[in-house]
Amino acid sequence: MTEKTYREALTDALFLEMRRDENVFIMGEDVVGGTGSPHAEPGFVGGVFGVTGGLHEEFGLERCIDMPISEAGIAGTAAGAALAGKRPVAEIMFCDFMGLCLDQLMNQAAKFRYMFGGKATCPMVLRTTYGAGMNAASQHSQSLHPLVTAIPGLKVAMPSTPADAKGLLSTAIRDDDPVIFFEHKTLYTISGDVPDGEHLVPFGKARMVSEGDDCTLVATGRMVSFCENAAQALADDGITCDIIDPRTTSPLDEDAILDSVEKTGRLVVVDETPPRCSFASDIADLAAGEVFSSLKAPIKQITGPHSPVPFAKELEGEFVPSPTKIRDAVSEVVNFK
């Protein structure tokens, strides 16, 4: 184990997978130069958040490709390369701009295997950032994972720790289906122990962050640590929680969630997207439909409001679920009569 940041863990996975398989290559806006730096300039960034830094020095510009500012072109080129036998890892800087490449993802990459009767695969990864917390305003702060989770044929990964960032990205690159890989912008600098060498985390297998008896908390990405903070405060009141990080929203580890809710009898789902058609509503529907008789209290969903993400720091702070809101929701369901 080595302590690494979330960003370093992702970079580590890219180095390992590109060394392992010459068909793996990266592409996207400024994935080589970053912030407009010339390729040969020392200290270049490598992508807007520095994840691809250093890759071109080992693998060259044929496998590290800076692309024009065209999300449709990036996603379409990646899908075509995947059909031809390559394993592209494409980067869309912010998930807010995925609308510009929805046809390539929704009608092309997601459908190839089905439309060709299982004879074609599309082993591409589309890395993108999401989430509020950096005062980046409404066009650079959205969380659009529910949008692509709803599309059959796409797999969706959302690591919350450096170890899972490395393990899930390696798994995504080796997968024969298209994977949308969401990286929360506020997590790049967090640190944690990361396995050395090859590390694979299976899709569809949730992580049990902590165990308790009184309530089940389900969250992804940044919201996992918020749940941990809330659980620590709740422990002072004698309330203990299962915290489940699904890791992937598609495929989803339904059994882990349902088994926990059957045990605790209470469920709080935390997601920073707006409430309508959200990850939170999806999990709430799953539990209500499958383990309703085990519930001791109404299911609570802690989400952002049905609103664009505000720019003002104070308003953005109110938009995002907080440990305090989570703690209050758990207290409410535990004390429900």
Predicted feature residues:
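Short, structured loop/turn "capping" segments at alpha-beta junctions
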Residues: P178-I180, I239
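Fold-independent oxyanion-binding glycine-rich loops
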Residues: G28-D30, M67-I69, I92-M93, T128-Y130, ...
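Thiamine diphosphate
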Residues: M1-P178, K185-K337
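Broad hydrophobic/π-residue packing in well-ordered secondary structure
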Residues: F97, L102, A110-Y114, L147-V148, ...
